Amino acid sequence: MEEICDLEGDDRELFSDQLCSIGEFARISAAHAFPLLTALLENRVCKLEERLTALQTAANSGSPIPPIQGMENLFEDLHWLLLIAGHMIADESTGETPLIPSAVVQYSAACVERTDVTATLDFMFGSQSGALGCSSMDKSRVDPVVKLVTCVCCLASAGNKAIASNMAHFLSPQVAGTVVWFLRNFTRSYLFPDERDSVELSASLSSIFGKDSTGGKWMIGFLLDTVRANLTYWASEPALAEDTVLLLLSLVDTKSRAEVAVSFECLWQLGQLQASREGPISQLPAEVHRFYVQALVLAGSSEGDHPLRDRYWKQFLQSMHNRFGIVCHQPNFVKLAQKEPIKAEVQSLLESFKGVALAVNAWNVNELFDFLLPVLRDSVTLLSVYHTCPEVAVLVLEFYVNAVEAFVNFLSQTQANHLFKACLSLLDTYTKCNMGKHSLSSLVEEEQFYDLLLLMKLLSHMLAQDILNLGPDDGTEKISAGDVTLYGLNIILPLITVELLKFPSLCEEYFKLSTFVCEVYPEKVVALPDGLFHNMMSTLEVGLSIYDSDISKMSLESVASLIEHFFKEMRENPPQRMLEIVRHFLRLIFNMVLLESFDMDLLQPASCAFHALICSNQGYYTELVRSLLAHQGDPVISQRLLGAFHQLTPSDMKLSLDKHSKAQFRRNLDTFLANVKGFLCRK
């Protein structure tokens, strides 16, 4: 126990595996685990309410605050009970639709005969009045899953009341954060679940939390009150503020929940606080503020017909637009830009615009594009003004990355053209502002080259527009995403050095981008100017020889794409530099696969590249084989090698890159390596 107490960090992360296992085991014996956890939580919530009541009574009477023993242990119990309960009722999911665990649904369904929906709703509604766990109300007719959730609501309600009574300093920020984490997990899985994704719900869970249910609507209102209370008092607590804003985001990240959320006055008040930038909201950390804006925009762009919806959304976005205009369009902005209040306001606005970009979806894309496009254009000027101020310049680049990623697959061609023109303007400005800035002498930390990393991500997102575009075709002449990407590569490639590629994040992003470009636009890559072309080929060579298997795999895939293009389109009239590249990489991969320590996990991409190179220059491949055989001192080994090479590339081998030929060569190479690699490999 002492070792656990000495650990620093978030318990949710430190003990994630253990908590997930406990949650799984609890579901296996749900009939035992749910009543047990509920009873333990009720007991601790009652104790907390009793102690808060004693403190409130003393404060109201003017008496000295009595010493309260055991509060630390009580908060510790609540924290861990909430963590266990949260992992029992729902799984934490990333990148997939959260579902109610089937074991929980089955347990609720098994209790349906003794469950009364009206009694369950009354029990849940009573949590807002407090002291629910200590009441004499008959709870035998209450759904056991809802009973557990209601205990947590009662704890949240106790916290809300303490905040309203100026007693929040007696509470634990850690417990408050765990409460909203639990409620967020619950919200994402249980509140208005999509029937197309969910397993069939029990009758009680469907009646209480299903779409258009009274219980679901009440719960959203209660949770919004909790969000408002927390942000009123806890905005300066980074971890708790983030958990609270993520709870708010979960309440509006589906249309069904957002349409209900906008009907509550509490949400409008949260929007007004953001618009005025008053009070504790202004203290939110940058990333939390970004999620806060995202949540408010999602709420405002729900498809409900609430009469205040349009006014809310326009007022909220208009306030940001007005602030941006006041700061950035003033006549003497360039002179005032470096003053701290101005710079801080610019940073705050850029974080807000990043939040708007995160809120883009298929239903609001046109409105948000019209709102953000002028800001994107003006942000190019900000990059020029603040190019010597990394903390602002990076925000501009991050804003572009977020916006392009959000918009690119939903835009009409006219909209995409406007976006790409803005990106070209950004790239031009970056070039002018950073001419000669990057050199090895300035290489101190990876963060200094974060701008290059962001530019690569920007180019990768633009490429996606040519691959997957769901936007309408309006017949407008197209600006090619590939051309814009190659234009950006012209800027980035001269700055990429072997030393820079030693930074893992930069290295991975560069090879992802280069692989993408080589696979989709090989004809544009082979047409690059000599300097840029050879620079890119050098980085691919480095990727083959230095880095981990993921980087080597991407380098091999890039080489295969370029050589296949050469074989199919350029073999009849080959440029000299491509002939040299074919010979160079054929020798490299020949040695890599046959003579050096080779990772067999790379067999598939290596086989594709090796096969394409052999087909493109079979004569040079034959020279390499003869040279290898000539250097064998043992005639037996030489003869064995000769036989193996005949099996690898038989004399009647078809010089083709069709699917069958590739598969046959891969099988041959696998057999070849199994037979002779042991005595060929040079350690």
Named regions from a protein language model:
Residues M1-K683:
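Karyopherin-beta/Importin-beta family HEAT-repeat alpha-solenoid scaffold
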